[in-house]
Amino acid sequence: NKTAKTTTTSNAKLTTSTNSSIGTTNVTEVTKNAMPSIVSITNMSVQEVQNFFGGTQKQESESAGSGIIIGQNDSELLIATNNHVVEGSSTLTVTFIDGKSVKADIKGTDSDKDLAVVAVPLSEIKDSTMDKIAVATLGNSDQTQVGDQVIAIGNALGYGQSVTTGIVS
């Protein structure tokens, strides 16, 4: 029976002072703990485009985004992402932290909220990959306040894993 680890990230607030950097250690620690839960998602889609002579032709395009492993049931790993990442897909591929890729299916979407959940069959994930990935423990957004520092971890523009910080406004 395959089971991904559970990753818990710190809910500690980042602190600053006039003589120190902005929570460098906390950002590093949170990032290190969260990375096994972050995936890259590649969307292959077929679109009709107009050619030079006014006719239409089908063209395959590729786009990329990121997701976070949010759950696991008896048969699949569940990943949250944005609807715009998976919209119009003919094929979805999820790439894990170890660089291994598997096909994924859309479980559900909400275009108004730009949310989607995709699933990867556990039977398609090698044991060596399962040992490296983790299900994220999500925080409580009701505890978030304006002015809190936040960390965004993802796959910016498909270039690989990226980290940035910001402030809730």
Task: Locate the predicted segments by residue.
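N-terminal activation segment of mature serine protease catalytic domains
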Residues: 2-52, 66, 90-91, 145-146
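Active-site region of chymotrypsin-like
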Residues: 7, 121-137, 164-169
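A conserved glycine-rich beta-strand in the N-terminal activation segment of trypsin-fold
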Residues: 20-29, 48-78, 100-105, 134-137, ...
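Residue-level recognition of beta-strand microenvironments
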Residues: 41-44, 72, 83, 107-109, ...
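Gly/Ser-enriched beta-turn/beta-hairpin loop segments
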Residues: 48-62, 97, 109-113, 119-131, ...
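Active-site substrate-binding loop(s) of clan PA
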Residues: 94-95, 105-107, 126-160
